[in-house]
Regions:
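Membrane-cytosol interface motif
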Residues: 94-112
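Short, charged cytosolic
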Residues: 1-26
Length: 203
């Protein structure tokens, strides 16, 4: 699921409008997937490939050469299929999927400059499509004043729109709600510097 140039522009304008009312920063990230782990697919493909000769020996008179060739083909084919993001994620328990997505969101929080901006007064609006995961992560200064539960309305709006295929609308709704919450606790300062780019990162 991708965003058009118009979607990017709309989201950028929403961030600018929200940040005009607060000294806080808003960063948005849309990830196609948070899981890049291949250990489980490799393990499953290897087990099936290793078990294959035993089955072939029991039920066929295949030569060793053909057996080895088929073993390699099965391993490679299974590995390719199991490494497809939807398949790979489907193999994981829900708790593991959420933990991986959360860890990736925290990495994005740090890499997009939110962990180092002034007073950590910024939030990350994060969605991982394959894992069906959405979360808002706040910097230390914001988290000290605004409980995580306060962001749930924005997360719910984000999920509702995204589930119906309107990803950009979901981000815009979340940005507006987050901007209102930030404005209550972090009004604009005399020098309201825009430290971070007003954009959505699609990765």
């Amino acid at each position: 699921m991708s965003l058009s140039k118009d979607d990017h522009d709309r989201i950028a304008r929403a961030i600018q409008a929200a940040e005009a009312r607060t000294s806080g920063e808003i960063v948005c990230v849309l990830a196609q997937t948070s899981s890049h782990v291949t250990g489980l697919p490799v393990f499953i493909a290897a087990v099936v490939a290793l078990a294959l000769p035993w089955l072939l020996t029991a039920f066929t008179a295949m030569t060793v050469y053909r057996m080895l060739l088929l073993q390699v083909i099965v391993f490679v084919t299974l590995l390719v299929v199991l490494c497809l993001p939807p398949v790979r994620v489907a193999l994981m328990p829900r708790r593991a999927r959420r933990a991986i997505a959360y860890r990736f969101a925290m990495e994005q929080f740090a890499s997009r400059g939110l962990a180092s901006n002034k007073n950590q007064s910024g939030i990350l609006i994060f969605v991982s499509l394959t894992e069906r995961y959405a979360r808002i992560i706040a910097g230390d200064d914001i988290a000290a004043r605004v409980p995580q539960a306060k962001w749930q309305e924005a997360v719910d709006a984000l999920i509702a729109h995204t589930r119906n295929g309107f990803v950009a609308d979901g981000f815009i709704a979340a940005i507006e709600l987050c901007g209102s919450e930030l404005a209550k606790h972090f009004p604009p300062s005399d020098i309201n510097r825009n430290e971070l780019p007003d954009r959505i990162y699609v990765i």
